[in-house]
Curated annotation (Swiss-Prot):
This is Fructose-1,6-bisphosphatase class 1. Its main location: cytoplasm. Binds 2 magnesium ions per subunit. Substrate binds at residues 115-118, 211, 277. GO terms for molecular function: fructose 1,6-bisphosphate 1-phosphatase activity; magnesium ion binding. Belongs to the FBPase class 1 family. NCBIfam families: PRK09293.1-1, PRK09293.1-3, PRK09293.1-4. GO terms for biological process: fructose 1,6-bisphosphate metabolic process; fructose 6-phosphate metabolic process; fructose metabolic process; gluconeogenesis; sucrose biosynthetic process. It is found in: Cytoplasm.
């Protein structure tokens, strides 16, 4: 039986589910960019890509060399194809305008070019997260210049989302709104090959992922919930839990998608003005879309993340996502 490549899968989606051809081409371009990023990451010290740039992004975070390289790869790969009206990235203050010399398309691409970049220098997993939205009609008609407002759509408006994880294997995990598929990069073929046909998250779990070093800063409902997890069989949840933490959302969520679990990055008291650490548009929304399509759930502790109306490109939110039973329990504690 022949193997199903990403290209073949997308063509079949165009035939059977009426996936627009432009969306298919866009996903293929993003996948090619991810292959290039994977190659750059794998070179490590041999490619002179380790270390920091000495600059900060809009988040106030020190930029790693590979942050900047990955951002440029995604911009250059996607700006000329005619599928996009614009792009937005964690590494850029403002929306990226498609240069006038290139045709414009009907979609918007939002991405974190290299999630978990603090892991680069220690050779731990990192990844690329992306989200695809339709561009509002008023910006397509040229009546309005593209600006940040075009991107400020709730996660329910996503038409596709996914991530690439660069670890022992490079994988692309994708949803077009009809389940979740996983593709593994065959380096001999140079193609992503379908290896995980229908990714599903178990409803219950015995694993959770959270940065325990922040415990003293958490709100009371989070303290209560995590203490119950740690209490194990003797506690109110009546079972033992294991904690895992990779310090890269893409790696922690990948584990949850493949074997279940709960990922938490709650708000804390260090910066009361910030409702969370993770960015809504290019981290929480695409990951929440994937998790829900895999049968899981995702909230900010109070409401479904995909229902949040964004107020800014770099808006932050608290995140609880993964196995439905545990997400619902953690969310219920916030409402008591």
């Amino acid at each position: 039986m022949s193997r199903v490549t990403l290209s073949r899968y997308l063509i079949e989606q165009t035939r059977s589910n009426n996936t627009p051809a432009d969306l298919r081409f866009l996903i293929e371009v993003v996948a090619r960019a991810c292959k290039e990023i994977s190659h750059a990451v794998s070179k490590g010290a041999l490619g002179g890509v380790l270390g920091s740039m000495g600059t900060e992004n809009v988040q106030g975070e020190v930029q790693k060399k590979l942050d900047v390289i990955s951002n440029e790869i995604l911009l250059e790969a996607n700006e000329w194809g005619g599928h996009l009206a614009g792009m937005a990235s964690e590494e850029m203050d403002n929306a990226y305008q498609i240069p006038g010399k290139y045709p414009k398309g009907a979609y918007l691409l939002v991405f974190d070019p290299l999630d978990g970049s603090s892991n680069i220098d220690i050779n731990a997993p990192v990844g690329t997260i992306f989200s695809v939205l339709r561009c509002p009609n008023e910006y397509l008609s040229q009546n309005e210049a593209l600006n940040e407002k075009a991107f400020l759509q709730p996660g329910t408006e996503q038409v596709a989302a996914g991530y690439a994880i660069y670890g022992p294997q490079t994988m692309l995990v994708l949803t077009l709104g009809d389940g979740v598929k996983g593709f593994t990069l065959d380096r001999e073929m140079g193609s992503f090959v379908l290896t995980h046909e229908d990714i599903k998250i178990p409803e219950s779990t015995q694993e959770f992922a959270i940065n325990m070093s922040n415990q003293r800063h958490w709100e009371a409902p989070v303290q209560r919930y995590v203490n119950e997890l740690l209490a194990g069989e003797e506690g109110p949840l009546k079972k033992n839990y294991n904690m895992r933490w990779v310090a890269a959302m893409v790696a922690d969520v990948h584990r949850i998608l493949t074997r279940g679990g709960l990922f938490m990055y709650p708000r804390d008291s260090r910066e009361p003005s910030k409702p969370g650490k993770l960015r809504l548009m290019y981290e929480a929304n695409p990951m929440s879309f994937l998790v829900e399509q895999a049968g899981g759930a995702s909230t900010d502790g109070h409401q479904r993340i995909l229902d949040i109306q964004p107020e800014g490109l770099h808006q932050r939110v608290a995140v609880y996502l993964g196995s439905k039973e545990e997400v619902e329990r953690a969310t219920a504690y916030h409402k008591e």
